[in-house]
């Protein structure tokens, strides 16, 4: 497969979902909560079906007063993926070893809050030479303006990316050899009957 700087493939990408926890989501105003959960479950299921490595993070879930797990939509699809818990807003230092272990240099990042944890992590990864694509409809800010401003900053770095459905539909149907196809996932999450 091609691996050009503008190409996102199932073989060169890592999905990074940052802090999709109920207490963080409570203050998100830039996307409907139900839509956010649906999109997250859909992209997580797509990545799983396509064998794309997945890295999850939480903030303050262990040892903090909040002890807040991930949103149910994620844990239902990825019950065996253990989140990396941290205490700082920039997840990059904590997730870098997991990203490096995949051997992949393209990150598909979604997170809460867009303007804080997601933006800081994306900028740090870009500074280290990673290609970063922001998944807008699996992310949320504390206001529409904050979310849009963060998107604009990332777009200035020319690293804006797909929506959850666009990532799902990029996979070949059926996949070569019939082994990896996200068509059933796309049908379940993005084309409900």
Task: List PLM regions with ranges.
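Short acidic catalytic loops
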Residues: 14-21
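Short acidic, Gly/Ser-rich segments with clustered Asp/Glu that frequently serve as metal-coordination loops
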Residues: 21-27
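A cross-domain feature marking catalytic cores of carbohydrate-active enzymes
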Residues: 20, 56-59, 136
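A short alpha/beta connector and helix-capping loop motif
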Residues: 11-13, 28-56
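Active-site-adjacent betaalpha module
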Residues: 2-14, 50, 61-193
């Amino acid at each position: 497969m091609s691996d050009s700087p503008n190409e996102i493939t199932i073989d060169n990408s890592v999905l990074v979902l940052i802090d999709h926890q109920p207490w963080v989501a409570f203050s998100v105003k830039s996307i409907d909560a139900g839509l956010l959960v649906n999109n997250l479950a859909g992209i997580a299921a797509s990545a799983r079906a396509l064998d794309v490595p997945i890295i999850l993070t939480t903030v303050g879930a262990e040892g903090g007063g909040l002890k807040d797990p991930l949103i149910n939509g994620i844990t239902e699809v990825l019950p065996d993926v253990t989140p990396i818990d941290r205490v700082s807003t920039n997840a990059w230092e904590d997730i870098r070893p997991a990203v490096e272990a995949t051997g992949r240099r393209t990150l598909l990042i979604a997170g809460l809050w867009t303007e804080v944890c997601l933006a800081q992590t994306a900028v740090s990864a870009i500074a280290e030479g990673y290609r970063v694509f922001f998944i807008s409809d699996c992310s949320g800010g504390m206001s529409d303006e904050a979310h849009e401003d963060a998107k604009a900053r990332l777009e200035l770095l020319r690293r804006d990316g797909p929506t959850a459905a666009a990532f799902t539909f990029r996979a070949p149907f059926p996949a070569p050899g019939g082994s990896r196809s996200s068509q059933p996932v796309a049908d379940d999450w993005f084309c409900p009957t």
